[in-house]
């Protein structure tokens, strides 16, 4: 049997969507799902991803 992996599925959510007063293309919060290796990356992920609601690249942080 295969071992249980150290990879877990995490959700990334935009940090600028709630605080931004810029004009939006549509309402909503941008979220992405990805995998991370808990053994190598113990802290929370923080990546620059495209936010289709704000129509620009923003910082997305890992949420629980």
Swiss-Prot record:
Residues 16-25 have a biased composition (Basic and acidic residues). The keyword Ribosomal protein applies. Signal peptide: none annotated. It comes from the Bacteria. GO terms for molecular function: structural constituent of ribosome. Residues 16-39 are annotated as: Disordered. InterPro entries: Ribosomal_bL33, Ribosomal_bL33_sf, Ribosomal_zn-bd. Transmembrane segments: none annotated. Belongs to the bacterial ribosomal protein bL33 family. HAMAP family: Ribosomal_bL33. This is Large ribosomal subunit protein bL33. The gene is rpmG.
């Amino acid at each position: 049997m295969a071992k249980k992996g150290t990879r877990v599925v995490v959700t990334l959510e935009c940090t600028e969507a709630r605080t931004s007063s810029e004009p939006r293309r549509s309402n909503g919060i941008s979220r992405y799902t990805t995998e991370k290796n808990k053994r190598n990356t113990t802290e929370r992920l923080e990546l620059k991803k495209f936010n289709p609601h704000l129509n620009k690249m923003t910082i997305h942080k890992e949420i629980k």
